Amino acid sequence: AQIDCDKECNRRCSKASAHDRCLKYCGICCKKCHCVPPGTAGNEDVCPCYANLKNSKGGHKCP
């Protein structure tokens, strides 16, 4: 099933301070992983792909 990344990322980023940045990275991760964890933070165990993507500095890429 196709996931609605815009909708899922709007939900995920609804409480983020850097909202635009959150949406951008969530969108990248959603397209790669076809999954966005539930809630606005945490719950990464639901989406291991999302949780394990790293940025160039080795930190978590996905919000």
From Swiss-Prot:
UniProt xrefs under InterPro entries: GASA (IPR003854)
Keywords: Allergen
Tissue: Expressed in pollen (at protein level).
Disulfide bonds: none
Family: Belongs to the GASA family.
Name used for this protein in its record: Cypmaclein
